Design a protein with these regions (language model features):
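Alpha-helix-loop-beta-strand connector modules within alpha/beta enzyme cores
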Residues: 1-5, 46-61, 96-113, 156-170
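Hydrophobic faces of well-ordered beta-strands that scaffold small-molecule active sites
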Residues: 5-9, 32-34, 55-59, 79-81, ...
Length: 170
């Protein structure tokens, strides 16, 4: 599968740097997730333009069905399903609920549905990857990198990622 690069940032960062945004695709950026913008708004609605950059939208377990449809219509890259209620890195992941919600979400869009927030181990990643188009592991990975002090710590991170990749690419 082709690797892609996405930026996650606040809308003002993109608005203040429209010239840079217009050249994102020149430097290999494929899409953006604007964390503080309502998901129902497309990039064009926000006053940001670059025809080659896709938008990623968040849908959570508490998003209403009506709003989910609007968010799916406004997104152009993929839908990022937030797998838990709470903050990223939390630990209360209900795999059966996640899988059911991802399947319901896929009925509202032709876009890929990625699932993340609170995903930390290969068992969770493997289970979710059976229904989702992809799995996002962010906080756990960033935390591991920040805590790494020596080469062997980085090797553990590499091995962790290799294990995750092996179970989701089955």
């Amino acid at each position: 599968s082709e690797e892609q690069s996405y930026l996650l940032n606040a809308v003002n960062s993109f608005l203040k740097n429209q010239k840079a945004f217009s050249r994102f695709d020149d430097v290999g950026i494929d899409g953006v997730l604007i964390v503080d913008a309502p998901g129902e708004y497309s990039l064009k609605d926000l006053g940001i333009s670059n025809a080659n950059i896709v938008s990623i939208s968040l849908v959570s377990p508490t998003t209403t069905k009506e709003r989910t449809k609007k968010i799916c219509n406004a997104s152009s890259g993929f839908i990022y399903y937030v797998t838990l209620k709470g903050v990223t890195g939390s630990s209360n992941v209900d795999l059966e609920e996640i899988k059911s919600n991802v399947i319901d979400l896929q009925k509202n869009t032709d876009l890929p549905v990625m699932a993340g927030f609170g995903i930390k181990n290969k068992e969770q990643a493997e289970s979710i990857s059976k229904v989702a188009d992809g799995v996002v592991i962010g906080s756990y990975l960033v935390e591991s990198i920040f805590q790494a002090k020596k080469t062997t710590d980085y090797k553990k991170i590499y091995n962790y990622l290799s294990e995750i990749k092996s179970v989701i690419n089955k």
